[in-house]
Amino acid sequence: MSYFGTDGIRGKFGELPITPDFILKLGYVTGLVLIENSQNSARKPSVVIGKDTRLSGYVIEGALQAGFNAAGVDVHMLGPLPTPAIAHLTRSFNADAGVVISASHNPYYDNGIKFFSGDGKKLTDEMQNAINDKLDTIMAATGSNDALMPILDPAQLGKNNRIDDAKGRYIEFCKGSFPYQYDLDHLTVVVDCANGAGYSVAPRVMRELGANVIAINHKPDGININAHCGSTHPEGLQAAVLKYEADVGIALDGDGDRIVMVDEAGHLVDGDGILYVLATQGQTKVAGVVGTLMSNMGLELALKAADIEFTRAKVGDRYVMQELEANGWILGGEPSGHILCLDKSRTGDAIIASLQILAVMQARGKALSDLTEGFEVLPQKLVNVRLSQMQDPFEHEELVAAFDKARATLEGRGRLLIRQSGTEPMIRVMVESDDEIECDVMANDLADKIKDTLG
């Protein structure tokens, strides 16, 4: 079976695959794959491990560490840090891989594992397949662990060390992405940390660049991560921006790789709006922008008006990255807030993306609401249909017929997207149209039909 979804391995803690026993085996087989692929047989491979603020992260961290050590791999422990920090520090420490323990924007009871290669990019499909194949073998042989996980001579085991200055290293990296000729003096910024991995570093970066920072949802307790806060629940940020009369608001998700923003009037600026500002008014001229199938048609039309090419990748930041590299471009992202600025960082980074927007505001002396003028969002309705188990809607003729009929109705003035979640039993129904009422009715009707058919 395949253990990897669209963004690593994820599930509810205590249920396969997110159990201590499975995670131990995952660390072990990943260590074996790293050893097999090592270009330097004279040294032990090494990995860095970071996590978000979920309580279950401590258990998973220990199991992963033990698995890697048993395979003969050294481990550098980073503690709670945003996902892009782990990607950066993987390169900084010349490690063979980076490991993130997080379920991103999911609730606290979920957790997951995602990997970076030594260059700070998501693992290749080939590497994931190699890990998956070894997992299949070891999971199929219940009770044979002694044979499948041979004990190494103690001299060959991996060792661990904790990196005490990991936060400081990442903070300096983020600050280095901000143009030296500007600062954030006289700017009031509300930062919603989602009680997640960015709770400490995000406010510090802004403060050290001179901003008056009002941090909210920055006191994690292990179970309040993403709880009615962060990029998936921006209502609190919008209220805080208005309450404190702030210049701008920034919301991260639980692992710090997604961002949405709020302008001074309390209006939400999602990933599409951020891409528009950076593409049309940013510090670096761009030839083209990569969005996804979920990107609003309004972004495509606004970029076309500015003579900037636009193309769509499959949903997922790894596919945005692939399309950027194929085109030789540097800017891409998703409406959900994964923003890739490849001239600043090799992975999606909420803090770095926000700094680029703040730099544009300072350079042009404009409010965020002024910068987003010219970008008109087409009415869009997204409905998530939660199912009892993973099912494919395209295997049911009556659903396919309903989808085809809706697409014919929207032809030339809108879009329909039906997408299965890669991490949970959910179907996403997205309708765009020049008619807001039609959007709402069509999306809900199709969602009801999916729910009635698939349960």
Swiss-Prot record:
The gene is glmM. GO terms for cellular component: cytosol. It comes from Psychrobacter arcticus (strain DSM 17307 / VKM B-2377 / 273-4). Catalyzes the conversion of glucosamine-6-phosphate to glucosamine-1-phosphate. This is Phosphoglucosamine mutase. Keywords: Isomerase, Magnesium, Metal-binding, Phosphoprotein. Mg(2+) binds at residues 104, 253, 255, 257. Activated by phosphorylation. PANTHER family: PHOSPHOGLUCOMUTASE (ALPHA-D-GLUCOSE-1,6-BISPHOSPHATE-DEPENDENT), PHOSPHOHEXOSE MUTASE. It is an enzyme of class 5 (isomerase). The lineage of its organism: Bacteria, Pseudomonadati, Pseudomonadota, Gammaproteobacteria, Moraxellales.
